[in-house]
């Protein structure tokens, strides 16, 4: 039985000042397995606490674990239950390696399409983000592992992430950037990680209003707040603002030694030397400054007690303090491998499919083109990097599935994701030994190969990483030119895009089909083959908007990357589809939020309001094959003088599997978030009037409407 709050309080009272200070800062893990480590107190039988990186899988140096698809791919399923199952699996893998907390999920909104960590986040929409946040937290914590949603808050770019100030209004914070974290807290998250950046001038580690007044007092968060690594701005400021645990608690040199990182290698910065901790920033604050601050009264003694109690309270909740933690660990199981494959397939989005180009026939002769088809696309660079025990490339998956021939040409040199941990070295020399069969990069050879096949499948990818933002939304390494050359030569061209977020597709009108598979993880080839050959319906829908780079609101320099040390969020709540759907928005998206095709055809009946918070619609699979539809409901608010609101906001969605010819009544619960708005003076308010409920297949594909009054 977990210790009670009274028991934890008694333990805190038994600790010396030195022992208390040792529990609120990290140290070097003697086993070398944990990203973050808190030493125990043997005198009182308080065990160690280990924290592992984990948005895409459990990262343990020198060990393997299941490499799940990127979070943006998971959100593309529009099925939070799958995120819950992933959380369960990741918790079991954490336990198998002796890790008590997982540093995830990542809950920052996709505000900047160029952001290098968009692959770690769910969506540009706060409702989707909140739903998946809650599901992931519930899954992780159901197995007695502490979830750590991050990075609180407004960490929407990597450029100058240590110093940039997100100059953001309260309405945008409340309506867009905070809901995911609030949902995680409501789901019982045991920890929250603060971001590197500043918000309205104050570093998040020292932001008392957001950390104590909003997170702890307003939302009732009773867990501990942990800093990002070297993300503590000051000892006194952070402790009194509400930070409970400083990580890593040791110097950068000691961290390098603990993880075997070459101290002479410069960690990736992509021309932005303030993206990575350096100099004074890497000096631990609590190690030398906290105890004197408590002794002088600068940090109240009861604040230190609260810090310790919050950490011990979560250790008690998962059974660490009474010796009941540890059962249920499992690593690289068949169940986890199957889940990784299911997530990858269901997160695959069919953007375009002219004249039934897909699915492929079993006996089609395929020209498989692309520099990365011989290796699985596991993820982006940074703290989310995972080493799987097994992985399946596109080449392996398609060859195993087809009855036809498969010819391979790389076309261009390999695009390698830079590693955040090896100095950013990315070997892209395209030497022959890099490719199966001694192939060398040659666009003409790729075009010739495509010309001889029934269909050309071109697999292209971007390269994103923590610590740097993409300079452009175009694909790197001449891949756009490769697609154009193949499309010009082939009878039928299918392009598979593996990206960490929105990309520009300048060749889209020249190809027959486009598939977005994001970073599919270890099951890359198996999942791709199942979708291309129709064994699985391409069930994913876009959780972000695809559009030309200069049409996003963050195309303005003052908004991204910012001028000096400020990024102005003066687009307010008009982010993503909210921007593109605005009445005065001239730019049309390439593919709208919620878009995704199916191999089946679906018909919608009339929409019907049910009660105060639900809408129902009949959906029919009008084709001769089974399919999976994602039914979406958007709220269009009434016009209120002097108030700018988005044209529509997502209110609910449901993924439904329908057999050929089947009809089902789908009921969607409508989130109150879509009806209300935040007023700086009055707080949350719902304007009186008629709200139009739009039901359809995307934010732009409305199939039925009804009205509800508030």
Can you say where each PLM-predicted feature lies in the sequence?
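Glycoside hydrolase catalytic-domain context in secreted enzymes
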Residues: 1-700, 705-710
